[in-house]
Amino acid sequence: SLLATQIVIHNEFSNIARKTGGIDYKEIIEGVVSDKRWSIQGSNETFIPSIVDYFQPGYGYGGSCFPKDVKALLEYSKGLDSKSLVLDSVIKSNDLQPLFVEEVLKENVDLKDKKKILILGTSFKPETDDIRESSSIKIVEICSKLNLEIYIHDPLSQEKFIDSLKTNLIGVKDWKKEILIMDIVLISTSWPEYKLIEELYKEGLLDQKVIIDGRGFLDNKIFKNNYFSVGSSKNS
């Protein structure tokens, strides 16, 4: 529950940074972890504790553990007649975090005509096929509501995801080929192979596409236009 709270509070801070303008939350985190209260200062190098991994903004936590554990502790506290306003807020804030996608789409995409969106990643984190409480589920709901034609790719969980949602999703095998005919590209899970988007952009193949990087996964300095990242106000 403590780790889940770290994720949520940094998501909220990153939302404030994005709406303030002129702020990149990645740079704020770099400054935070340079503080000796968050890192161990050696004679020649700084040792960064792994808890800092939970400072990175995104769509919110998912999987089989965090959602269940936070809810269980909240219910336990209620049974003790002990109010836990923080845990209650953690759950509510985490549920709202994917709305970042809806906000970006409504503000930056002409939705009058049907658009194609490629959602990259369906598992709740990379290196697993676990889709339980994956942010991709909420993202698909948002895209369906906006009448987008939804294409998805995931190295491990793609078929499982399609079968579980029972909605009109189109799975793709070669995302590097399909990305060229999309209007919108959204990174939902930070699989390493999706870093190739940076090279495709440099080659001029993605100039007219809206790219939504809800993991802050790509190097935002590369993009010149239509790139939207959580924790950054930069529409490059």
What are the functions of these language-model segments?
Residues 1-236:
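Structural/interface elements that position substrates and couple domains in central-metabolism enzymes
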